[in-house]
Every structure is written in C-alpha cells, then in structure tokens.
Amino acid sequence: MSAEKKYVVALDQGTTSSRAIVFDQDANIVGTSQREFTQHYPKAGWVEHDPMEIWATQSSVFTEVLAKTGLRSEEIAAIGITNQRETTVVWEKATGKPIYNAIVWQCRRTAAICEELKARGLEEYVRENTGLVLDAYFSGTKVKWILDNVEGAREKAMNGELLFGTIDTWLVWKMTNGEVHVTDPTNASRTMLYNIRDLKWDQKMLDELGIPMSMLPQVKPSSEVYGYTTRGGGSRIPIAGIAGDQQSALFGQLCFEKGMAKNTYGTGCFMLMNTGTEPVRSNNGLLTTVAIGPKGEVNYALEGAVFMGGATIQWLRDELKIIHDARDTDYFASKVGDTNGVYLVPAFVGLGAPYWDPYARGTMVGLTRGANRNHIIRAALESIAYQSRDVLDAMQQDSGIKLAALKVDGGAVANDFLMQFQADMMHTPVVRPTRIETTAMGAAFLAGLAVGFWKSSEELEDKFSVDREFIPQMDRDDRAKRYNGWKKAVERSRRWAEEE
C-alpha cells in the first residue's frame, strides 16, 4: 500500500438519495455529498426508479465529493458500495440500456405472482432454501414481471441478450464500463433466487419463474477487488466491497461474531443478529439471511423489520400536529413518569415482524380523561421500543442466544429517552456509537480490508468508540406490567381491516 493512498470512499445508494462518503485511516468522515432522485408511482402500490438517474446521481456525488475535499483519485485506496436491497434492474448486455425502470423493493405489483407460487406449493421451498417469505418485496418476481410485460424481453433473455442486477450490480457494471457483472451474497440472498445453504443460484427457483441463468451476475465475496473504475479522473480505483444496506450496517457496527446484533432506527426499524456459520430457521416470523464474518466471509443472520419507527413520530408532527419537530419528543415524553395507561400501536400499514398482519390497523387504547399530549407523545416513542422488543424476543427464541448488548444506529438514536426506555424494556444494555454513519462505514471497511488499507477486523475494532451506553434501570415487575399492556394493545389492533 503506497503512502499516498489515504482514503476509502463509500457509495451509499439509498431509496431516496445517492451519497458518497470519504473515510480516512481512522474511520473519520472527511467529506460527504448527496443527491436525491425521483420516485415514480405509475399506479397505486407501484414504485419505480430510473436506473439511469440512479447512475447519474451516484456518479456525480462521487465526482463532487472529490472536488469538495480537494482529493485526487490517486489518493483513494478503494471504493465500497452499499445499497437499497431487492430493487431490480434489467438491461441489454450490448448497449447497457435498461429495458424498463428499476422496480423498487417497496413495489407491490407482483403480489399476484407470489399468490400463484403459493398455490403451486412453493412457500416451504422458498423458506427452506432462500430463507425468505414468499412476498413481492424480493427481486425474483420483479424480474419475472419485467420479462412477462416488456415486449420482446423474454425472447431476448433466452438468447442471452439481457442482464439482471440489484443496484450494486448495476453500479459496478456502469463504473467498469460493462466489464464486470457481479454481486455479493448479502444482495443475492434478497432475490429469492439464491440458495443460502449452497451459496449458489437456485435452479429450481429460476425454472419456476422462467429466468435464464445467463441473466444473473457472478456472486463474489463481500470483500474482494471486483474490478476498477477511472471515474473521478486519472488513476484506476479498485471497487473492493459490496453489501446490502442492513448487512453493511451490521458490519459497520462490528457485529462480526455469533450473537451480536444491531437495530437501525429509521423510518422503520431493522434488527439483525449475526447467527454465525449456520443458517437459523425462524419459527417466529423473522427472515433468515446472509451476514458477513470478520474476514468478509459468509455468515448468517436473523432479520426482523418493523414498519413504523420514526414514521410514527412523523405522524405526530404532520397529521396530529402535536409536535413541531421530532426532536421535541424527548422533552415532552420526559415531562411525565409514564403514559398514564395509554398505548399507541402504530399499525398504519399493518404489522411487520414478528406478526406479519397486513390487516392490523393503528390503535390508541387506555385513554382516560386525564390523558394529555405528553402521554400520547410518550406512548408513540414507547411503541418503537416495544416493537423492537417483540423482534428481539423472537430472535432470542429462534437463535437460543441471550443478547449481551444491542448496538444502535439511525436518526432516532439521538433521542436519549427512547434509548433508555429501549434498554429498560429489553433488559439489555443499548450501545450508541460515536459515529452513526454505520451503513456507509460497513462498505468502507469491506473495501479497505480487501486492499490492505486496514489489515484486520481487530484493527477496525480500535476505530469503534461508544458515545453512550444505556443500562437497564426498570425493575422486573414494572417492565413485565408495561410489556403485558403492550401485548394486549397489539391484540386489539390485529385483524381490524379483514372485513373490508
């Protein structure tokens, strides 16, 4: 490693924006650049992105961040990529031109294809071999939809003229001028086309969906030099790390070992627990997915998604208008000792893990004449912690592992009240790191390890510092009483919309 290679760049391609973040040897952020892009909603429940706009924004933020920081491409040791998972691009091999917009992970248009696969008895096969539930969320049915609905697409696919990729694959293809068609196991594991036991594309799933093997990228480790780019002008920079956003955050939080877990508090909450070298099947509504071990090798994880985390606070602000700013919630919630018996179940779009109840609806229970604004705000914050406790309980049951501490990241972790209540409700210490850009950091770490910029996972552990550790303070009886009230409230919210 020559002395002037002082930085690693993480490209963080998210659902609403593309970002580039420069890290130095001490994992400090030296510069960032960000651009939003257009969300397309052609029909109710459909969500698309323009792959060329994704590429344009991602390419330009990379150039911008170098210009902003005054860095030359010669000073960049490697590029790591982290991305929104499941979002699907199909393009022509010869021209590099997408044949349709990217179908986004949130898009529900393939629900009918999923129902058809269930009717053919594939649910158990999908669960056992891909670790996933049969749902429109994942890429496989999206590829089938494009082949079925774009004129001439299936014929071109059969002739080997089309390529498929998740966003990581598309970016690497563009950055290497069409030389490299690759993905990593974390992204492959979200397609419903990848066998997480054999770590190979699953021929049966490809046959069931009518997708030719020739469309698929090569699956390579999450930390490896895949190819080079001359973007940013001048020298060839190695592209050396790839991970889906949640797995990247798990790696960025240094959850390399079995039994370590992180929770990301964003619009929703994503909790992942590293379960080591063997996949753990969930009997409690979680997904079995691929994680990354300390040397970039394949590990496994359990994953649980809560739909309404920070979005519950947005609802207080935008719809109820009882706060002006999300940051106010800490102040109001701390003005009262409890919620005065009020529970808010934010099942506005149904409930995610571990319930998976699309018919649940938002519910506020336990209201009395004395209930006021502070109680409702506190109940909204507490609902985020209760839902995360639901997921953690399922994880501990499935894995047989008692969590020693939960690492946290995402916007809502700045809320001290929420973090303390989370620790109390889980009876588990909650660790907030100094650097909360853990998703981008994970991609940077993977790339840096691949080129020797950092020598080992032990060296990375020296870069991790704790801002604050929240220790449980609530007594057992109080915790049990409050959580039992939550379970009762959840029951009231369930199956509400079924009769519609």
Curated annotation (Swiss-Prot):
GO function terms (MF aspect): ATP binding; glycerol kinase activity
Keywords for this protein: ATP-binding, Glycerol metabolism, Kinase, Nucleotide-binding, Transferase
GO cellular component annotations of the record: cytosol
Pathway membership, UniProt: Polyol metabolism; glycerol degradation via glycerol kinase pathway; sn-glycerol 3-phosphate from glycerol: step 1/1
Protein's GO biological process: glycerol catabolic process; glycerol metabolic process; glycerol-3-phosphate metabolic process
SUPFAM superfamilies reported in the protein's UniProt record: Actin-like ATPase domain (SSF53067)
Known EC number: 2.7.1.30
Protein residues bound to sn-glycerol 3-phosphate: T15, R85, E86, Y137, D245
Record-listed glycerol binding positions: R85, E86, Y137, D245, Q246
InterPro entries: ATPase_NBD, Carb_kinase_FGGY, Carb_kinase_FGGY_CS, FGGY_C, FGGY_N, Glycerol_kin
Reactions catalysed, as given in the entry: glycerol + ATP = sn-glycerol 3-phosphate + ADP + H(+)
Parts forming coiled coils: none
Protein residues bound to ATP: T15, T16, S17, T267, G310, Q314, G411
Catalytic class of the enzyme: transferase
Source organism superkingdom: Bacteria
HAMAP family from the UniProt entry: Glycerol_kin (MF_00186)
Known role: Key enzyme in the regulation of glycerol uptake and metabolism. Catalyzes the phosphorylation of glycerol to yield sn-glycerol 3-phosphate.
Family classification: Belongs to the FGGY kinase family.
PANTHER family: GLYCEROL KINASE, SUGAR KINASE
Name by which UniProt lists this protein: Glycerol kinase
Name of the encoding gene: glpK
